[in-house]
């Protein structure tokens, strides 16, 4: 499932007032005023028991959501379903540096060190059993 499909699924099934961000490189993907959510979307081709989040994305979500008085959410799709993570202080994320591609689906395949953490599926809410 591509991020555009994930957005449409969420809009159709969960958040009818979901609005996409306007910029390609915004620090978020969408918002819902009805549910007071500031959301980053991620589509994964492979299912894992933990889902990666970059520290820089996490920090941007926390700061920008707080400035807008919205709750920061990180929503992931995998081949086995959709998981939503409300990024609250009680979710402890161990951070580590990993050598990863600069981007996921673009022509630039070079790698850099990135600070990342892994969210256990149990810390999120499963929105659908399979998509």
Put a short name on every predicted segment.
Residues 1-24, 67, 82:
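Acidic-basic catalytic patches of nuclease active cores, encompassing PD-(D/E)XK
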Residues 23-24, 42-44, 77:
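Histidine- and/or cysteine-centered catalytic micro-motif in compact active-site loops
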Residues 25-29:
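Beta-rich nucleic-acid/ligand-interaction surfaces
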Residues 30-47:
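Conserved catalytic cores of phosphodiester-cleaving nucleases, focusing on short active-site segments
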Residues 45-58:
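Active-site-adjacent loop/helix micro-motif of nuclease/hydrolase catalytic cores
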Residues 55-68:
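Basic, amphipathic alpha-helical patches used to engage nucleic acids or provide basic targeting signals
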Residues 65-91:
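Nucleic-acid nuclease catalytic cores
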Residues 83-131:
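Intrinsically disordered, low-complexity terminal regions enriched in charged/polar residues
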